[in-house]
């Protein structure tokens, strides 16, 4: 089963225009769902994505990508 990324297009700390290409670079075969993830509180202050149904958050997008890569390489 492939990886799944879910990101919000409405949260203030998440820029999907830059995040989506980075997620595709990590796993080009992963499914990517864009829409509200009901994670609004943390989404105001931190960049986040759900990776295989688990939330991953970081203060900025670069740190988020590092955390996602680490999570998938376990």
UniProtKB/Swiss-Prot annotation:
- Family, per the entry? Belongs to the UPF0741 family.
Taxonomic lineage from the root: Bacteria, Bacillati, Bacillota, Bacilli, Bacillales
* Record InterPro entries: DUF1450 (IPR009910), UPF0741 (IPR020880)
A Pfam family found in this protein is DUF1450
- Disulfide bridge map: none
Taxonomy, superkingdom: Bacteria
What is the protein's name according to its record?
Answer: UPF0741 protein Bcer98_3905
Which organism is the protein's source? Bacillus cytotoxicus (strain DSM 22905 / CIP 110041 / 391-98 / NVH 391-98)
């Amino acid at each position: 089963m492939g990886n799944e990324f879910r990101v919000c297009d409405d949260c203030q700390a998440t820029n999907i225009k830059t995040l989506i290409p980075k997620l595709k670079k990590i796993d080009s075969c992963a499914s990517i769902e864009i829409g509200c993830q009901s994670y609004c509180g943390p989404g105001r202050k931190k960049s986040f994505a759900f990776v295989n149904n688990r939330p991953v958050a970081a203060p900025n997008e670069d740190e988020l990508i590092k955390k996602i890569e680490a999570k998938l390489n376990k």
